[in-house]
Every structure is written in C-alpha cells, then in structure tokens.
Amino acid sequence: MKHLVIRNLGPLKEADVELKRINVIIGSQSSGKSCLLKTACYCTWVEKRIELTQTEDFFARDGNFLKELERFHKLKGYIKEDTFISYESDFMSFSFDNATKSFTFDWMEERWNYRRSKVTYIPAERNLVAAIPNWFQVKFADDNIRDFMADWETARQATANDLSVLNLDVSYHYDANTKSDKVQVADGVTLDFTNTSSGLQSVIPLFVHLSHITKIKHDRIESFANIQENSVLLSKLDEEDKRDVYTNYVHTHHCDIFLEEPEANLFPPTQSNLVEWLLSLTKGEQPNNLFVATHSPYILNTFLEKLDDDINLFFTDNQEGQMLVKSATESNLQEIYDYGVDAFFNIETLG
C-alpha cells in the first residue's frame, strides 16, 4: 500500500491518505481534488524514475522535485512557501519540504521487487484531440495535456481495425491513408471524429488510449534512454538476481491510471457502463491501478455497487475555509450509497 501526505498545495491544507488499487475522490469544484490526483500521479512517476535509474539525485537537486510537479501538471501558483509532500511505498520513501528546500529519500526492503508500470494521466481536456483536427501541428507546453496527446497518437495509429466503444453501438478506427480518425455511429454512417457528439469526443480518447496501453503491457521498448537505464541497473545487481529483477524493470507489467472527470459529457447510464469497464481493467493476474477524480454521483454509485476491500473513497472537506482530504468510513460509504444524488448536496456532513 502507498501512503501520501500533502500539505499546503493549492487549496489543500492537508491530505493524508492510504492509496489502494482503486481510489476515488469526490468534492466540489476548486476544492483540491485534482491536486491530490496530480500529486499521486507525479509521485508514482517519481518512484518509477528513481527505480529505473537507481538514484534520486535529479529530484534532490535545485528544487527539481517541485519544479517538475509544477511544470508537468500545470500547478503554477499552487506551490506555497510551506508546501510539503511525502510518499511511501513498499519500495521507497521520499519527501520534499519547500520551507527548508530539503529532499529526503530512503530505500525500503522491497526495493528490488518493484515492477515497472506505465503511468498515465488522462486530463479533463482530452477532447482537444477531437475538437482541434490539426492538434499535432499546434505547439503545446510540455505538460500532461501534451503527454496525453503523444500517447493518443500512438494508440490511434495502432487502432486500424474497428474498435467497439463500450455499449454505445459505436466503433472507432484510424485511417492511415488519410491520417484521420473515423467513427461509425449507430445508423452505419461513418463520421470524422471532429464531427461527432461531445460525449464521444470525451470518451473515445480515453477508451482507445486505455484499450491500447492495457493490451501492450508486456512489450519491451528499447529507446536509447532505456538502454542507458538498463546498463546502470545491471551494474548494481548481483549475478543471481539479474534475470528476475531485470525482467521486472524492462517489461511493463501493469498500468497506473489517473483519470480526471470520466463523466464528462456522458449520459448517466453511459457513465455507469464506463466505470464497469474501468473496473474490469483492475482485475486479472496483473491488475492495473486506478485513481479517479469525479463530480458525478452516477460514477461514484457504480464504484460503490462494486465495492471490495481494495477501493478507497476520499472527499474534500471545508473546515473553516481550509480544505482537507478525508477518507470515507464504512458508514460514510453506506450513507452516500443510500442517499445517492442527495448525498452530494450534503457532502460537508460526511466530515
């Protein structure tokens, strides 16, 4: 299990949470949901970088830990003089205290049992790939939107055959000849992606992307950077450990999925169907991890209907003008499930 602590980041005064395989955060707008989601994603990525390079030096230098978080996740103006972040897993622990500009790091006992993951952040702005037909010609900042677009480019080009999208009687494919995205709708008509409904423009990018990355998990990608990382890794291993550890590090074993507002522009039954599909990605021999930020009672209720021991629900709580992240108790979960939409109008009572 992972333990994440955040203090004084954006609207968040404090978050102290245990992360499970499935995590969901709810709360009002501008209450810090995305701050928690983005920081959890970032710390998961930092863990991966340190494991693959076997050094924390980059993040310990020149305030790089917070600089990279601010740049990639568009958090300019959110960092405060006393911002503090700490993360602990079975493999390592690290923290950064902006008040003292200090980065601390320790390896944990399970250091060599780490298994490489594909860390993916799916932003609320994912429909840009449909709304702007020539998005690949537009210069974007090097942030999570650009990163998702790069992943989308890989996924779309790999989807030459029709891919059915949920239960919508809709399919998507990429036409390599015209370098365009095509969507076949219920009446058999094929549309350019940019001419489809807002709901399809929101759900197709995340569906195609996740369908792609969760099916290629075991592929080994040998970029120049990866070759350098692998050489460093091998130099640190005992001969008898090399085979098992090397396989865990160079092959992607699962995905860490961080998803903003899956409900965007979707009819409630479709929202529920999407959650059921997302949950299917967390099953199997090598389950993927999922963290969702949502405003939707339909999204939340579908998660609660499938509730198991490996899901955590968090909610933002306004206490005297300061936003805290709380973990829902069993009674909180039952109350939300029993009252459905009404619970969202009284979310402050959960605290």
Identify the role of each PLM range.
Residues 264-266:
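ABC ATPase nucleotide-binding domain "signature" loop
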Residues 269-351:
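C-terminal lobe/lid and adjacent interdomain/linker elements of RecA-like ASCE P-loop ATPase modules
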Residues 22-24, 119, 254-258, 289:
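Residue-level preference for the first positions of well-ordered beta-strands
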Residues 14-20, 185-186, 248-253, 281-285:
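Phosphate-binding P-loop
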Residues 9-11, 24, 31, 126-129, ...:
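Short, solvent-exposed loop/turn segments at secondary-structure junctions
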Residues 1-42:
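Pre-Walker A-like glycine/lysine-rich segment at the N-terminus of P-loop NTPase domains
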Residues 40, 44-256, 319-338, 343-346, ...:
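Phosphate-coordinating catalytic segments in nucleotide- and nucleic-acid-processing enzymes
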Residues 260-262:
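Walker B catalytic acidic pair
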